[in-house]
From Swiss-Prot:
Organism encoding this protein: Bacillus cytotoxicus (strain DSM 22905 / CIP 110041 / 391-98 / NVH 391-98)
Membrane topology classification: Single-pass membrane protein
Protein name: Potassium-transporting ATPase KdpC subunit
Source organism superkingdom: Bacteria
Keyword Nuclease: no
Keywords assigned by UniProt, alphabetized: ATP-binding, Cell membrane, Ion transport, Membrane, Nucleotide-binding, Potassium, Potassium transport, Transmembrane, Transmembrane helix, Transport
Oligomeric form and interacting partners: The system is composed of three essential subunits: KdpA, KdpB and KdpC.
UniProt keyword Ion transport present: yes
PANTHER family: POTASSIUM-TRANSPORTING ATPASE C CHAIN (PTHR30042), POTASSIUM-TRANSPORTING ATPASE KDPC SUBUNIT (PTHR30042:SF2)
Pfam families: KdpC (PF02669)
Length: 192
């Protein structure tokens, strides 16, 4: 037997073992642990309405109607297959132009809110293009518009927002946030 033939058997066996280990055992183990420890996350954090999936708590959706709260700006129009955004440096003139355009759009949609009070997350693009959450300040900044369009009182809308504020992860990481889809589902219930 040649040296090449002596190596062939162990290489084939090692390949087979690695395929089974990495392609079957490891994924099955990780899936099993995820299903046991955090089933909602493992299943995609899906949100149902009348038995139909209407979205995910983890992936943002575009809301353009004035009667609903709006999320972060998405460079990819919330298409999950192409996650990402133009990551402009602060010195890039295109970032300034894009932000100024967002501010102008904000002023058209929300004339009662002074520009100096516009939360940054409503006029800057999401890094992933899929952010499902906004800051509580961003939600409260939209109350006048939503109240006008839906005839829900401002006080009631503020209470809805307050009830949907999620704290920091583990009390340490990130910032307080409001899930836009869940918030808008509550608004939809109130106007039906």
């Amino acid at each position: 037997m040649t040296e090449k033939q002596n190596l062939f058997g162990p290489v084939v066996r090692l390949t087979g073992v690695l395929v089974v280990l990495c392609g079957l055992i490891y994924p099955a183990m990780v899936t099993g642990i995820a299903q046991g420890v955090m089933k909602d996350h493992a299943d995609g954090s899906l949100i149902y309405e009348k038995g139909e999936i209407i979205g995910s708590k983890r992936i943002g959706q575009e809301f353009t109607s004035a009667k609903y709260f709006h999320g972060r700006i998405s460079s990819i129009a919330y298409k999950a297959e192409g996650s990402g955004s133009n990551n402009y440096a602060p010195s890039n003139p295109e970032l300034r132009q894009r932000t100024e355009e967002s501010i102008e759009k904000w002023k058209e949609d929300n004339p009662s809110v002074p520009v100096r009070e516009v939360p940054i997350d409503l006029v800057t693009n999401s890094g992933s293009g899929l952010d499902p959450d906004i800051s509580p300040k961003a939600a409260y900044a939209q109350v006048d518009r939503v109240a006008k369009e839906t005839k829900i009182s401002k006080e009631e809308l503020k209470a809805i927002i307050a009830s949907h504020i999620e704290g920091r992860a583990f009390g340490l990481y990130g910032e307080e946030r409001v899930n836009v889809l869940q918030l808008n589902m509550e608004v939809k219930k109130r106007i039906q």
